[in-house]
Amino acid sequence: MKVFIPKLDQFVREDHPYRKILELVDFKELTQALQEEYSSRGRGGYPVDTGFKCLLLQYTEDLSDRELERFLQENLAGKLFCGFGLDETTPDFSYFSVLRKRIGTSHLADFFNPVRESLKEGGMIREIIT
């Protein structure tokens, strides 16, 4: 007997905004400097680009750490965006504060600004001066 395990990709519509962001932003390249600071020793954790995408969702969706934990458990588009599978465990709330400390709150803008520029170039956002 074969067990069919569906792919997360099947449950998120093709025109979802998170998919467009993934097309426009090279998160691996963006987080390369952070990756170099991670040790290759010890138990492996979540990939750096995955953690950064979680923080980006937290910012754009205006979520607390605990709300982000639940969002990633329940929201299929959020799981897809961050790179989690249907059956993968997502981080708990404490992971996000540790990651922010590791990056440094003042340096988050250094990573968010290139994302903003890519989204502007891709036509997803625009600046309105009033």
Annotate each PLM feature:
Residues 86-130:
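Active-site- or DNA-interface-adjacent structural scaffold in DNA-acting proteins
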Residues 52-62:
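Alpha-helical support elements that line or immediately flank enzyme active sites
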Residues 43-49, 88:
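Secondary-structure capping and boundary motifs in well-ordered enzyme cores
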Residues 67-80:
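DNA-recognition alpha helix
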Residues 29-43:
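Short, Lys/Arg-enriched N-terminal segment that forms or immediately precedes the first helix
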Residues 39, 73-74, 116-117:
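Short amphipathic alpha-helical surface patches that mediate protein-protein
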Residues 1-25:
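Charged, often Cys/His-bearing segments associated with DNA-binding zinc-finger transcription factors
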